[in-house]
UniProtKB/Swiss-Prot annotation:
Belongs to the RNase Y family. GO terms for cellular component: plasma membrane. Keywords: Cell membrane, Endonuclease, Hydrolase, Membrane, Nuclease, RNA-binding, Transmembrane, Transmembrane helix. This is Ribonuclease Y. It is found in: Cell membrane. The chain crosses the membrane at residues 1-21. It is a single-pass membrane protein. It is an enzyme of class 3 (hydrolase). It comes from Campylobacter curvus (strain 525.92). InterPro entries: HD/PDEase_dom, HD_domain, HDIG_dom, KH_dom_type_1_sf, Ribonuclease_Y, RNase_Y_N. Residues 333-426 form the HD domain. The keyword RNA-binding applies. Pfam families: HD, RNase_Y_N.
Length: 517
């Protein structure tokens, strides 16, 4: 029994010990699990904090990016607004300038109309005065002894005529001077605008071209055996070839710029190739001529495009390119036409005309010069005929006629072309005139002035652009001097051809002489 109890007690003790051991293990596992749970909780908490922090950074970056885009957009819009505002200001200024110009023109028109009305009224008053004076004088002279009716009438008419001429001269001089002042002021403004806004290149043509060669041995090859090569060159190319002692150079001379340019290119190719013989010369001449014809067409098309003009007929375009090889008084015709086109466009724009049409007329005003080597007739008639054939604008045709005085300018654009042509052609150094023609023109102008009654002497000065006329003070009074100047100017316009204008100055000097004895 005791043994049983002892065994039972030992079993109970073993069970208790096992329970305690198991509990200890469970407690240890629980603690481990708890620590792991805490660690995971901390990790989750850290990750949550990190995620929150990253989220805040992303939000800040997004806000920064959005603000930057907003600022960029705002800056761009402000810049565009500023540009639009500046453009509107410029347009507004242009409109204001145009309005001011219109107001000035309106004032000038009103002023001219009032002056015309005043002149008309003064004329009526003068007529009435004239008639009343005649009646009064007739009544007085009827009672004068020793005078017949016819003699009295002649005396009265002579006095009235002298008085009327003096009054008319006074009125003409008054209004003419005022009109000249206003016109000169306006013209100076327009010309200043035109010349300041356009600065063209100066192009003067010579009568020779120089071809450089590597050595003087090539001169002999160009001459050829018994002069065969040089004879063929001169016959085919149509130029004079001068081979002298000038080192490393051959001179080509011709008044025809087109032939001279082709000849220069042909000889350059011959010298470069080395094969100089008659057959080769003819082949190269044909090839170079075809290339030049193509380049002429392209040159004309490029000029039309550069000026911003509407389509021009290909034949006229080709003639524009040919102007490059024409010259007038040493001035290149194409350079002159381009200069006139630009100046005419500016002048037309300043005076309320069509700028594009003025440019077109300016470019084509001398187009006939491209035909003068092939056809008979003046360049004015040839140019007008070719433009009529290809249905150019009537203003263009009128400008062609008007710039040499064959017709009156019928539009602002035609008048602008005439003014631009004078600006381009008459400026110092633009053209070279033959001395004989210059002297002949000066002599003709002086003779016209001397042919007038009461003129003692006349002198052409300032390169023939001014004529100073010395009047006899006993035969011509101050009022008559005004009329004489106008008569001389009108006769010069009708009989003398000249570029620009000629100023007529009538000088009358009165001297009172006495002697002390």
């Amino acid at each position: 029994m005791i043994e049983v109890l002892i065994g039972l007690g030992a079993g109970v003790a073993g069970v208790g010990a096992g329970y305690l051991y198991a509990k200890k293990i469970n407690d240890a596992n629980y603690n481990i699990f708890l620590e792991q749970a805490k660690a995971k909780a901390k990790a989750i908490e850290y990750e949550a904090e990190l995620t929150l922090k990253n989220s805040k950074i992303s939000v800040q970056e997004a806000e920064f990016e959005a603000k930057k885009r907003y600022d960029d957009k705002t800056t761009k819009l402000q810049k565009e607004y500023s540009q639009k505002f500046d453009e509107l200001n410029k347009k507004e200024q242009i409109l204001l300038n145009e309005q001011e110009l219109l107001n000035e023109n309106k004032e000038l028109f009103e002023k001219d109309r009032n002056e015309a009305k005043l002149t008309y009224e003064e004329g009526l008053n003068l007529k009435a005065t004239y008639q009343s004076k005649v009646q009064e004088a007739l009544k007085v002279l009827e009672h004068a002894a020793g005078l017949t009716e016819d003699e009295a009438r002649e005396v009265v008419l002579k006095k009235v005529e002298e008085k009327s001429r003096a009054d008319i001269a006074h009125i003409v001089r008054k209004h003419e001077e005022e009109a000249k002042r206003e016109a000169k002021k306006r013209v100076n403004y327009i010309l200043a605008q035109a010349t300041s806004r356009f600065a063209g290149e100066f192009a003067a043509e010579r009568l020779i071209n120089v071809v450089n060669i590597k050595n003087d041995e090539l001169k002999g090859r160009i001459i050829g055996k018994e002069g065969r090569n040089i004879k063929t060159l001169e016959m085919v190319l149509g130029v004079d070839i001068i081979i002298d002692d000038t080192p490393h150079a051959i001179i080509l001379s011709s008044f025809n710029l087109y032939r001279r340019a082709i000849a220069t290119r042909v000889i350059e190719l011959l010298v470069e190739d080395g094969r100089i013989q008659p057959a080769r010369i003819e082949d190269l001449h044909k090839k170079v001529t075809e290339e030049f014809e193509q380049s002429i067409q392209e040159e004309g098309e490029n000029i039309v495009i550069d000026l911003g003009l509407s389509k021009i007929h290909p034949e006229i375009t080709k003639l524009i390119g040919k102007l490059k090889f024409r010259a007038s008084y040493g001035q290149n015709a194409l350079a002159h036409s381009l200069e006139v086109a630009h100046l005419a466009g500016i002048i037309a724009a300043e005076t309320g005309g069509d700028e594009k049409l003025a440019k077109r007329a300016g470019l084509l005003h001398d187009i006939g010069k491209a035909l003068t080597h092939e056809f008979e007739g003046s360049h004015v008639d040839l140019g007008a005929e070719i433009c009529k054939r290809y249905k150019e604008h009537p203003v263009v045709i009128n400008a062609i006629y008007a710039h040499h005085g064959h017709e009156e300018a019928t539009s602002i654009e035609s008048a602008a072309v005439c003014a631009a042509d004078c600006l381009s052609a008459a400026r110092p150094g633009a053209r070279r005139e033959v001395l004989e023609s210059f002297l002949k023109r000066v002599e003709e102008v002086e003779n016209i002035a001397k042919s007038k009654d009461g003129i003692k002497q006349a002198y052409a000065i300032n390169a023939g652009r001014e004529i100073r006329v010395i009047a006899n003070a006993k035969l011509i009074n101050d009022d008559e001097a005004v009329l004489v100047a106008k008569e001389i100017a009108k006769e010069i316009e009708e009989k003398v051809q000249y570029p620009g204008e000629i100023k007529v100055s009538v000088i009358r000097e009165t001297r009172a002489v006495d002697y002390a004895k």
